[in-house]
Curated annotation (Swiss-Prot):
<feature type="binding site">
    <location>
        <position position="112"/>
    </location>
    <ligand>
        <name>ATP</name>
    </ligand>
</feature>
<dbReference type="InterPro" id="IPR005811">
    <property type="entry name" value="SUCC_ACL_C"/>
</dbReference>
<feature type="binding site">
    <location>
        <begin position="331"/>
        <end position="333"/>
    </location>
    <ligand>
        <name>substrate</name>
    </ligand>
</feature>
<keyword id="KW-0067">ATP-binding</keyword>
<dbReference type="InterPro" id="IPR005809">
    <property type="entry name" value="Succ_CoA_ligase-like_bsu"/>
</dbReference>
<comment type="subunit">
    <text>Heterotetramer of two alpha and two beta subunits.</text>
</comment>
<keyword id="KW-0547">Nucleotide-binding</keyword>
<comment type="pathway">
    <text>Carbohydrate metabolism; tricarboxylic acid cycle; succinate from succinyl-CoA (ligase route): step 1/1.</text>
</comment>
<dbReference type="GO" id="GO:0006104">
    <property type="term" value="P:succinyl-CoA metabolic process"/>
</dbReference>
<keyword id="KW-0816">Tricarboxylic acid cycle</keyword>
<dbReference type="GO" id="GO:0005829">
    <property type="term" value="C:cytosol"/>
</dbReference>
<protein>
    <recommendedName>
        <fullName>Succinate--CoA ligase [ADP-forming] subunit beta</fullName>
        <ecNumber>6.2.1.5</ecNumber>
    </recommendedName>
</protein>
<dbReference type="GO" id="GO:0006099">
    <property type="term" value="P:tricarboxylic acid cycle"/>
</dbReference>
<keyword id="KW-0479">Metal-binding</keyword>
<dbReference type="GO" id="GO:0004775">
    <property type="term" value="F:succinate-CoA ligase (ADP-forming) activity"/>
</dbReference>
<dbReference type="GO" id="GO:0005524">
    <property type="term" value="F:ATP binding"/>
</dbReference>
<dbReference type="Pfam" id="PF08442">
    <property type="entry name" value="ATP-grasp_2"/>
</dbReference>
Amino acid sequence: MNIHEYQAKRLLHEYGAPIANGVAVYSVEQAEKWAKKLPGPLYVVKSQIHAGGRGKGKFKELDPDAKGGVRLAKSVEEVVANVKEMLGKTLVTKQTGPEGKQVNRLYIEDGADIERELYLSLLVDRNVGRVAFVVSTEGGMDIETVAEETPEKILTLPINSTQGVTSSDCARLCDALDLHDSAREDGEKLFPILYKAFCEKDMSLLEINPLIVMTNGHLRVLDAKVSFDNNALFRHPDILELRDTSEEDPKEIEASKHDLAYVALEGTIGCMVNGAGLAMATMDIIKLYGAEPANFLDVGGGASKEKVTAAFKIITADPNVKGILVNIFGGIMRCDVIAEGVVAAVREVGLKVPLVVRLEGTNVEQGKAIISDSGLNVIPADDLDDAAQKIVAAVKGA
């Protein structure tokens, strides 16, 4: 689960991280009221959407030469003028896709005199099974670009979970970021704070880009992106309250209601599979035969007929889907239950695209018989390779 920048900053500030004074606003009236209470004289007006690249983004409704989704203002009047121009508009960035995202809230904060921009993030390093810091002196840039062009400017530092962030870790991070004097002292305080927040709140990503050194020598969190492990949200009702469903794919929201693991992709072949590993393999073989999956969808090990029907509705809600592949290995999951769900779903949604079903495992013969006796136009497959070839051929022939 993602949250907005202003929410991430509030959370980090609760742990003691240095942030600027700021306020989230939903209207022009709020913007004028609260901007007057900020110290000024420099303000930053920032679009709040779940996507990066906001500063270089463009609003669909405005002139192509208009400013982007992050703007400087030198007076309250300029703040208000920018809010009027930005609020309710559709911001297109490199991460939103061409459809963009509507800006329903803005964050107004004090400006800062910047001396240097740095990059800092925490993530789970699966290679070593630890939370790791990733830092670079090249802040304000796309870290993937830095990794590709100048990897020597990036330090990845895994943290020993039994010791936490040690003084030695702090020294290495400060050296990598070239921090001195007050900035170094701030860094030695900040790194343990961020690690504590990451672990206690079950984050999957904490990214600060940039972390700035101001002209007064101190550090400040200028931008923050935080993602949480969805599987741990039951432990954090306070975090769950920060969820903004308007920023999420409606299909993914509907899937979560039925305990389905769903991720929308950009292809044309819808997939319904049980088990994450099998789902990944299914997507891989679809690509192998020259097509693209439209989604990742894992129905889990104990899906009911109702759950399967819900999965079909979610897949067919995507207008890009030109065919569907159901690939089930019945271990805990019974193939006859899947078959009943498939038949019920096809009848309920009035399926108009090709459907290939591959079943194997528990009660497979009963499952195949249910589909065969249904009289529906379902293409059976003997194995995964056969299923992938059939659905790709059916879609290309459609």
